[in-house]
From Swiss-Prot:
Superkingdom: Bacteria
Organism this protein belongs to: Synechococcus sp. (strain WH7803)
Protein keywords: Ribonucleoprotein, Ribosomal protein, RNA-binding, rRNA-binding
Function, as annotated: Binds directly to 23S ribosomal RNA and is necessary for the in vitro assembly process of the 50S ribosomal subunit. It is not involved in the protein synthesizing functions of that subunit.
GO BP annotations listed: ribosomal large subunit assembly; translation
Keyword Ribosomal protein assigned: yes
Protein name according to UniProt: Large ribosomal subunit protein bL20
GO cellular component: ribonucleoprotein complex; ribosome
Pfam families (UniProt xref): Ribosomal_L20
Length: 115
């Protein structure tokens, strides 16, 4: 069986990693070994943060809704409970958007839950 040298494959693999590491600071973007470590770490962070982003945005929406609801004299939990009882099907993202962009409409929604 003939000996197979890895020239092409190894170079492509290294270049792929270095391409992913472009823009990293110092040797992290130029030396293969450190670049490989940084790329693996970056990919782990990206995977984790794609999931975390969903949680973070939900927390942001809830904080905005709570602040706007308290301006209307009702707490967040009572507002959400009232929306469920009144069968108002609007999600937290849209509620937060209303609270920021159109406070008068948000007040209308709050009043609908108290009736």
């Amino acid at each position: 069986m003939a000996r197979v040298k890895r020239g092409n494959v190894a170079r492509k693999r290294r270049n792929k990693i270095l391409r992913l590491a472009r823009g990293f600071r110092g040797s992290n973007g130029t030396l293969f070994r450190t670049a490989n470590q940084r790329v693996m770490k970056a990919l782990c962070n990206a995977y984790r943060d794609r999931r975390r982003r969903k949680r973070d945005f939900r927390r942001l929406w809830i904080a905005r809704i709570n602040a706007a609801a308290r301006l209307n004299g009702v707490s967040y939990s009572r507002l959400i409970g009232g929306l469920k009882q009144a069968d108002v099907r609007i999600n937290r993202k849209m509620l937060a958007q209303l609270a920021v962009a159109d406070p008068s409409s948000f007040t209308t929604v709050v009043n609908a839950t108290q009736g």
